[in-house]
Amino acid sequence: MELKLEGITKSYTKGKKRKNALEDFTLTLTEGVYGLLGSNGAGKSTLINIITGIIGRDSGNISFTDGNDNSFLSHLGFMPQGMDFYRNFTAKDYIKYIMALKKYSPDNADEYALTTLGKVNLRADADKKIGAFSGGMKQRLGIAQAIVG
C-alpha cells in the first residue's frame, strides 16, 4: 500500500493576511508507522487534518495504491494530539461515532465497539461519559479511535 500526496497546498486567511500552512507539499508513504516532527506552525496538524479528511485542501492530489482519492481513509488510523473528544458521549458511543464516520456497517457496531474498547482496557467503562475520564483513560480511548481508523 502506498499513500501519495502531490502538490498539496492549504492557506488560511486571518484578518487581511493570507498565510500558507502548506505549499506544494509532496510526500509518499508506504505501509508502516510514521510520525511528523517540526516547529510550531510548520503545518503538521494541517497535513494530518487534510489526510484524514477533516479539512479540505486548496490544491493538490491524494492517492492510495489504486488511485482512489478517498479509499485510503478506511486503512488509516490516527491518534489526535489534543484528545478533543466529545465529553458528553460515552466511550462506546464515541467509538461507534468514529465507526460511522469511517463508513463501517452498523451491523454489530455495539459488539465491535465493545471489543475495541476491551483491547485498551476500557470495556468496563464503555457506558461512562468521556468527560469523567482521567487523562490516561482518554489516552487509551485515543488508541481505540486509532484502531477503528
Language model regions located:
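Conserved ABC ATPase "signature" region
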Residues: 96, 100, 108-125
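Helix-to-loop junction immediately C-terminal to a conserved catalytic motif
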Residues: 52
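Walker A (P-loop) phosphate-binding loop of ABC-type ATPase nucleotide-binding domains
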Residues: 39-43
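Q-loop/switch helix immediately C-terminal to the Walker
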Residues: 82, 88-101
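A short, flexible loop at the N-terminus of ABC-type nucleotide-binding domains that lies
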Residues: 1-5, 9-24, 30
